[in-house]
Amino acid sequence: MLFRSEFRIVDAAGKALRVQPIRSRREGRYYAIWAEGIPAMGYKTFEIVLGDGKAAEPRRTELRNNSLENDFYRIVFDPASGTIASLYDKELGREMVDPDSEWKLGAFIYESLNGDRHQMERKVFDNYRRSSLSDVHCPGVTSGDIYQSVRFTGKAEGCDEKFGVQIEVRLYNDVKRVELGYDFIRKPETDPSAIYVAMPWLLENAKLTFDVPGGVVRSGEDQIPGTSASWNTVQNFVAARNDDAQILVSGSEVPLYLLGKLLDDPYRQPRTYEKPHVFPWLMNNYWTTNFRASQEGEFKCGFVISSTRDTSNTAASQFGWSARIPLCTRVMPAATAANGNARDRSFLRSGCSHVLITSCTPAASGEGILINLRETDGQAGTLTLLDGSGRELPFTAADATGRPLDGRSVTSLALKP
């Protein structure tokens, strides 16, 4: 947003939304806006109401007792390393970070093969080193109506020292959500190296699962023999899950994760792990083909973390899709009074809680739309499609290409387990 004037953003009932400054530039200040109840497959508009004063400045304080806290989590930081030493879930009564792990939560890990690229051709890792941040500083804490934010800056191998590695931890005020953000400039390096982020979860007897297009995979179990069992490609979420709870991670910029532990033998089969540790793999040049041997430039990425008693794939899928897919927004110019009113509308939603709408496109026939659906928990149910008022909409079951299966128009469809 380009103005520094006092303003409110209000919904159709006149209720003001919470806003929080993110950053300022010469052309103005940018804000985060907390908008709730956005309709599925629809939209919600708000009005911007200007005031006469100036917008409030961000509230900055020092990090006290190395900790942040809200109704859901208590975070204890290690300011010397710019990491999280403890993440305690108050609802579950659980510590989420493994205290015995070599790497704390959020640790920025640089890995080098010490110039020995032939290890990859021999499929062994026996000559390597790993390091984390040095010269770490904490500029302080920013508190707002949406979240509290702690920033750390430090230096790392393979990264521009002047720019540094910048880490931000956000603890949201009213939802069970923690975010980790990273910003650094990668220096060109032809020797084999990689960068990871550490997420050493503590959850007894937990299995690591992740979703791929069309389903959920248990790491090392539900995979075709011989496929990658160390670095997995993740679509929307990774979950550390046992019978009582699950810890969830989602990120939009980094699709590769090493699940289990940082490996000395990443090509080992079959893949097993003792603890549910997760390592997003930010970047690497571990290849032996004729791709460019170095990577360089600024790189930004982020991860969303949550935890819940609900151990279903449905809960994990809803979290992952919501966290990874951005909410599209537009600022519309002022118009007539009627057109500028706040409003909302939903065109379509699923009437079955464990059915996910994965895509919606115009049908090739030019008549209607083709909706791709996925049942997430292997449960029986009744599929219905509802409009904004909750009225059941007629539909025809079709295959993936849009060809009708039987041609009948129905308002419900029985789902088999």
Where are these regions (language model features)?
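C-terminal (or distal) subdomains of carbohydrate-active enzymes
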Residues: M1-P417
